[in-house]
């Protein structure tokens, strides 16, 4: 019998063990450019460890997932953080796990609104990008440079995500 994962709304508090939620937070807002622009300052910090490492900006186009979806693997980046911010304004799923002795624990699933992004801290277990409904573009900030910045883990028995409510 498969083990089903519940989908919860993405909130700063619930996501705090894994990184930051990137959204327009009034507490971080300041006016700039003569009062014509609201700047939501320092919502997350990019990490790029190792000699020759640098922070880069990418555009990812995620293809929609089919449901029910089997979460059979997780990945993490030991040398850098990775952030995903939707450019298409569509919701997406965020799947993360706490580390349990060098392997991912039971995954947690969050539904991000189309105006929310996430920043996975360095070394946080997460599932690759999970677009919903249709192909969606994401601005991705992560690390480039020497060294293997990808570790993958495959579960013996996948966890299952039911289709998110519309």
UniProtKB/Swiss-Prot annotation:
Provide the alphabetized UniProt keywords.
Answer: Lyase, Purine metabolism
Which terms does the UniProt entry file under GO BP?
allantoin catabolic process; purine nucleobase catabolic process
Q: In which pathway does it act?
A: Nitrogen metabolism; (S)-allantoin degradation
Alphabetized Pfam families for the sequence? Ureidogly_lyase
Enumerate the cofactors the protein uses: Ni(2+)
**Keyword Lyase listed:** yes
* InterPro entries in UniProt: RmlC_Cupin_sf (IPR011051), UAH_cupin (IPR047233), Ureidogly_lyase (IPR007247), Ureidogly_lyase_bac (IPR023525), Ureidoglycolate_lyase_dom_sf (IPR024060)
**What reaction gets catalysed by this protein?**
(S)-ureidoglycolate = urea + glyoxylate
Query: Which GO molecular function entries does the Swiss-Prot or TrEMBL record give?
Result: ureidoglycolate hydrolase activity; ureidoglycolate lyase activity
- Determine if Lyase is one of this entry's keywords: yes
Q: What is its EC number?
A: 4.3.2.3
Quaternary organization: Homodimer.
Of which family is this protein a member? Belongs to the ureidoglycolate lyase family.
NCBIfam families referenced in this protein's UniProt entry, alphabetically: PRK03606.2-2, PRK13395.1
> What does the record give as the function of this protein?
Catalyzes the catabolism of the allantoin degradation intermediate (S)-ureidoglycolate, generating urea and glyoxylate. Involved in the utilization of allantoin as nitrogen source.
What is this protein identified as?
Answer: Ureidoglycolate lyase
Traced from the root, the source organism's taxonomic lineage reads:
Bacteria, Pseudomonadati, Pseudomonadota, Alphaproteobacteria, Hyphomicrobiales
């Amino acid at each position: 019998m498969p083990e089903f994962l519940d989908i919860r709304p993405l909130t700063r508090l619930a996501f705090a063990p894994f990184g930051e939620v990137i959204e327009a937070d009034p507490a971080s807002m300041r006016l700039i450019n003569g009062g014509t622009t609201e700047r939501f300052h320092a919502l997350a910090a990019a990490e790029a460890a190792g000699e020759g490492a640098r922070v880069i900006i990418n555009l990812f186009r995620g293809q929609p997932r089919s449901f029910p979806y089997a979460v059979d693997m997780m990945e993490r980046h030991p040398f850098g953080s990775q952030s995903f911010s939707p450019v298409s304004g569509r919701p997406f799923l965020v799947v993360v796990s706490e580390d349990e002795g060098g392997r991912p624990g039971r995954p947690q699933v969050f539904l991000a609104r189309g105006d929310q992004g996430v920043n996975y801290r360095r070394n946080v277990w997460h599932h690759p990008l999970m677009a919903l409904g249709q192909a969606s573009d994401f601005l991705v900030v992560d690390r480039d440079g020497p060294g293997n910045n990808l570790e993958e883990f495959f579960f013996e028995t996948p966890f299952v995500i039911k289709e998110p409510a519309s």
